[in-house]
């Protein structure tokens, strides 16, 4: 969306800058079919506003390893399909490799779709301590989330 940056800036303009640091914008791989200078500038501007940028569902769509160094992402969110195939030796190698690449590119790797303690332990063993999924917290309605005390 060409006007997204302006729209978001207007919405956040009355907000303390420190709150922007708690916002994470997840972008799916399909956005990167055509990387343009305008897209790169928009992403850079969003980061300058203090937002964290995450590439969501990495590894299953139109992603390319080249995107990891050409676009200003803070996080790489590895798709849950890798967790579903965690017992396959090649998948374990891919996950271990992604953990290494993320570290080398100074990006945070988040593995999505973790549902069991066994998966959690295996992923930690593969170098992926940051995880997301039903094991940690099921999705909540917004009203219930807002009613919870901050930790």
Short names for language-model regions:
Residues 2, 22, 26-35, 51-151:
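EAL-family c-di-GMP phosphodiesterase catalytic domain
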Residues 7-15, 41-49, 93, 97:
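Catalytic-core regions built around general acid/base machinery
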Residues 8-20, 43, 69-72, 124:
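Acidic (Asp/Glu)-rich catalytic clusters
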